[in-house]
Amino acid sequence: VLLLSQDYGKYKEVAELTRTQILAASYELHK
């Protein structure tokens, strides 16, 4: 369970980073 929790935290971190990059990229496109 602990390992799963750590993996989920890592996944969540990566997902947020990816989402931020996508938002930044689309912002640059529409600027």
Curated annotation (Swiss-Prot):
The keyword Cell membrane applies. Spectrin repeats lie at residues 1-10, 11-19, 20-31. One of its GO terms (biological process) is central nervous system formation. One of its GO terms (cellular component) is plasma membrane. It comes from the Eukaryota. It is found in: Cytoplasm, Cytoskeleton; Cytoplasm, Myofibril, Sarcomere, M line; Cytoplasm, Cytosol; Cell membrane. The modification Phosphotyrosine is found at Y27. Keywords: Actin capping, Actin-binding, Calmodulin-binding, Cell membrane, Cytoplasm, Cytoskeleton, Membrane, Phosphoprotein, Repeat. One of its GO terms (molecular function) is structural constituent of cytoskeleton. Belongs to the spectrin family. Interacts with ANK2. Interacts with CPNE4 (via VWFA domain). Like erythrocyte spectrin, the spectrin-like proteins are capable to form dimers which can further associate to tetramers. Associates with the gamma-tubulin complex in brain, but not in kidney, liver, sperm, or uterus. Interacts with CAMSAP1. Can form heterodimers with SPTAN1. Fodrin, which seems to be involved in secretion, interacts with calmodulin in a calcium-dependent manner and is thus candidate for the calcium-dependent movement of the cytoskeleton at the membrane. Plays a critical role in central nervous system development and function. This is Spectrin beta chain, non-erythrocytic 1. It comes from Capra hircus. The lineage of its organism: Eukaryota, Metazoa, Chordata, Craniata, Vertebrata.
